[in-house]
């Protein structure tokens, strides 16, 4: 199938192109009776929105969301919710020089080989602009999960290019354009300014977490919670790696330290990242994603044209020197969509299950 729908019971179908009239999504499976308006969705879109600082693309899109269906008198009806975001600041002429060439690192070549046709305007369907509808859908999921379980999603940047970022406090994340958990981002700004002047780009590492996640979410064997989390994160543009819990550091750990000990007072560690056997443990979901450097750069690079001949490509237009800067709200949204889908699946299959053992605390 065509791969434009994410989720099973909370299913989100994404539509649109970067330079088309609009982008959006249809959410099928949202429970009825939840209060919902654009004010519940717009704040997350504003966090992802382009043109908010000199360190991101200067494409100035308001990303104003419209609710076209699925809400009546301020409440969800249980029918499909259509969310629409109009494109207002396209500059398709910026892509005239690449109509007959393939940009290195982009989906131009593979889209053409697969479909026999491609939309060169801003990458068309492969553009990161299509993450905006997922952020909108994620806001709906976040609201339902918070109201039912108190679940809270957070994210921050922990590395940009070669610069590691030491975590100080979540409180600093909303106050700077990097979503960095530090008070002073001057070193990050200087680093990005050097890259911008050089016409180059860099990657980033993003941490995402969810707290107050109910125990029991996940469907072994093949729809494990962590499997679906990894699947969701890899669906984000430019993501090339996912770690859950201790991740690749687990290789150097011993079983005596990696296994998260349980006590009557709670878990003593969280190397598993909140998932055991593919099922949520009630601990915080903890993960990190690796984002590659932006492929659209001013540095000349070797490629081929539509005839297979050698050519040189210089990408013009307005692009993020580090796509990881705006990835935090996107990753939060995708995690929320996974948790939401599994919460509904758990309620459907195991809603009547009771056990005598009360869940222990997520941490001591």
UniProtKB/Swiss-Prot annotation:
InterPro entries reported for this sequence: Chorismate_synth, Chorismate_synth_AroC_sf, Chorismate_synthase_CS
Amino-acid biosynthesis is among the record's keywords: yes
One Gene Ontology term of the molecular function aspect: chorismate synthase activity
Protein's name according to its UniProt entry: Chorismate synthase
Keywords: Amino-acid biosynthesis, Aromatic amino acid biosynthesis, FAD, Flavoprotein, FMN, Lyase, NADP
Reactions catalysed according to its record: 5-O-(1-carboxyvinyl)-3-phosphoshikimate = chorismate + phosphate
Quaternary structure and partners: Homotetramer.
Pfam annotation, one family: Chorismate_synt
Record PROSITE patterns: CHORISMATE_SYNTHASE_1, CHORISMATE_SYNTHASE_2, CHORISMATE_SYNTHASE_3
Binding locations of NADP(+): 48
Protein family according to the UniProt entry: Belongs to the chorismate synthase family.
SUPFAM superfamilies, per the entry: Chorismate synthase, AroC
NCBIfam families listed in its UniProt record: aroC, PRK05382.1
Phylogenetic classification of the source organism: Bacteria, Pseudomonadati, Pseudomonadota, Betaproteobacteria, Burkholderiales
Main function: This reaction introduces a second double bond into the aromatic ring system.
Gene Ontology biological process terms in this record: amino acid biosynthetic process; aromatic amino acid family biosynthetic process; chorismate biosynthetic process
Major enzyme class: lyase
Ligand binding (FMN): 125-127, 237-238, 277, 292-296, 318
